[in-house]
Curated annotation (Swiss-Prot):
Family that this chain belongs to: Belongs to the universal ribosomal protein uL1 family.
Organism: Mycoplasma pneumoniae (strain ATCC 29342 / M129 / Subtype 1) (Mycoplasmoides pneumoniae)
NCBIfam families with a match to the protein in the record: rplA_bact
GO cellular component, one term: large ribosomal subunit
Name of this protein: Large ribosomal subunit protein uL1
Amino acid sequence: MAKLSKKMKIAVGLVDKTKLYPLQEAVDLVKKTSITKFNGSVDIAVSLNLDTTKAEQQLRGAIAFPHSVGKPIRILAITDDEKAALEAGADFVGGIDKINDIKNGWLDFDLIITSPKFMAALGKLGKLLGTKGLMPNPKTETVTDDVPAAVRAYKKGKKEYRADSFGNIHMSLGRVDSASNHLVENALALLDLIKSRKPATVKGIYIKNIALTTTMGPSLKVKLPD
């Protein structure tokens, strides 16, 4: 096991590993214990009681956070109405030409938004796009009849969420220099959404654990807000 740096030892020493921190206290402390020189990310991990081998328990969708989570994303809009997509804020626009660019190895974007018309062509790139989490999906509203509206929503801060194979959802809530109340409100928005999407087939405890951390800093266990 790698030795902890002096800064990390001090940061770890400020955290009570046996404590479930109220959300506001956790946010304040996780910002304080970030040890990066740059403006790191404040991240949340939510562990859910899901059996992801069952289709109805595979949580995936999109959330419009109340506050910016920081890093802007590069959007590729694959659409017939390129002008409207550009005006909405898309970084790249095109049709089959852009799909061919992807086929030839171009991946300088973070998100694809498209209309159903182009999904057959994109589907042929499933192995490439799927492994990188770039395949558009109706559940995340990245396959839509209104591409410009989706572009505007994602440019304003809408983000995809997805439970991994172990039932965990990991997301950034903002940056270390974000206002604490903004981080709290983003966390509450995500937790409220997760609660509202509880599959009917889940029995017993649904949200098992919540943790906050930064790009480089100790993890804090968080009490589920009422």
